[in-house]
Amino acid sequence: MLLGQLSTLLCLLSGALPTGSGRPEPQSPRPQSWAAANQTWALGPGALPPLVPASALGSWKAFLGLQKARQLGMGRLQRGQDEVAAVTLPLNPQEVIQGMCKAVPFVQVFSRPGCSAIRLRNHLCFGHCSSLYIPGSDPTPLVLCNSCMPARKRWAPVVLWCLTGSSASRRRVKISTMLIEGCHCSPKA
């Protein structure tokens, strides 16, 4: 997913969600936390979203606890009650955009049977990146699944010296490897 699409998603989640009237809720004059402005509703069949959202959840643990409580109460909703509670998405926009991905230096060893080994300083991409899945009525749900991937890379030749049939002669074997210079969170290809 492109950064522009992610920004659009975050803008939608930050106050442009519809209220019970179907119109976007007007911005309140007092400042509020990002989480308090991002509401979603668990709707039963034929239920309308409530006009007043519940207060913000503080953590994933509270969110998951609410999910369990809602699963226990699903029998009531299926028996005809239209009562639905608002659920706050516990998303921090900085956590969604920013991942912990970096290039970690290591010494890579290249060798082949009968050849002398060569050591080359390289980098590997290591860290965690955010992922997101938003279900909806659209057959293609919004999915963001980032991986820690090379941002700057180049191919470099590596020369190995290998022995031939006689111990006195050697030949060059040229191979190439990718040298990683930097990493970032990027959608999986």
Swiss-Prot record:
One of its GO terms (cellular component) is extracellular region. InterPro entries: Cerberus (IPR016860), Cystine-knot_cytokine (IPR029034), DAN (IPR004133). Gene3D superfamilies: Cystine-knot cytokines (2.10.90.10). It holds the Pfam family DAN. Residues 1-22 form the signal peptide. Expressed in the retina, in inner segments of photoreceptors, at or close to the outer plexiform layer and in the ganglion cell layer (at protein level). It is found in: Secreted. Induction: Down-regulation during the establishment of embryonic left-right axis could be due to translation repression, involving BICC1 and possibly DICER1, and/or transcript degradation, involving BICC1 and the CCR4-NOT complex. Attenuated DAND5 expression lifts repression of NODAL and defines leftness by induction of the left lateral plate mesoderm NODAL signaling cascade. The keyword Signal applies. One of its GO terms (biological process) is determination of left/right asymmetry in lateral mesoderm. Residues 101-186 form the CTCK domain. GO terms for molecular function: morphogen activity. Glycans are attached at residue 38. Its main location: secreted. Disulfide bonds join 101-148, 115-162, 125-183, 129-185. Transmembrane segments: none annotated. Keywords: Disulfide bond, Glycoprotein, Heterotaxy, Secreted, Signal. It is linked to Heterotaxy, visceral, 13, autosomal: A form of visceral heterotaxy, a complex disorder due to disruption of the normal left-right asymmetry of the thoracoabdominal organs. Visceral heterotaxy or situs ambiguus results in randomization of the placement of visceral organs, including the heart, lungs, liver, spleen, and stomach. The organs are oriented randomly with respect to the left-right axis and with respect to one another. It can be associated with a variety of congenital defects including cardiac malformations. HTX13 inheritance is autosomal recessive. Antagonist of the extracellular signaling protein NODAL, which is required for correct left-right patterning during embryonic development. Antagonist of BMP and TGF-beta signaling. Independently of its role in left-right axis establishment, plays a role during heart development, possibly through the regulation of TGF-beta/Nodal signaling pathway. Displays anti-angiogenic activity by inhibiting endothelial sprouting, migration, and proliferation. Once internalized by endothelial cells, may alter their redox and glycolytic balance. Belongs to the DAN family. This is DAN domain family member 5. It comes from Homo sapiens. The lineage of its organism: Eukaryota, Metazoa, Chordata, Craniata, Vertebrata. The gene is DAND5.
